[in-house]
């Protein structure tokens, strides 16, 4: 069964992970987010429960 032979597939997987880790990931992490996190506190609105007419 050729799919159980790890000879070509392990090398392809290893090469793809190394490509991702060494080339693609640093390029993606260098981008600045469009909405940086802020220290603003969130406001919670008080909601009233719905009154069901049949209860």
Swiss-Prot record:
Protein name (record): ATP synthase F(0) complex subunit 8
Annotated compartments: Mitochondrion membrane
GO molecular function, one term: proton transmembrane transporter activity
Disulphide bond pairs: none
Region (Disordered): 35-55
Superkingdom of source: Eukaryota
Provenance organism: Chaetura pelagica (Chimney swift)
GO biological process: proton motive force-driven ATP synthesis
One of the Pfam families matching this protein, by short name: ATP-synt_8
InterPro entries from the UniProt entry: ATP8_metazoa (IPR001421), ATPase_protein_8 (IPR050635)
Quaternary assembly: Component of the ATP synthase complex composed at least of ATP5F1A/subunit alpha, ATP5F1B/subunit beta, ATP5MC1/subunit c (homooctomer), MT-ATP6/subunit a, MT-ATP8/subunit 8, ATP5ME/subunit e, ATP5MF/subunit f, ATP5MG/subunit g, ATP5MK/subunit k, ATP5MJ/subunit j, ATP5F1C/subunit gamma, ATP5F1D/subunit delta, ATP5F1E/subunit epsilon, ATP5PF/subunit F6, ATP5PB/subunit b, ATP5PD/subunit d, ATP5PO/subunit OSCP.
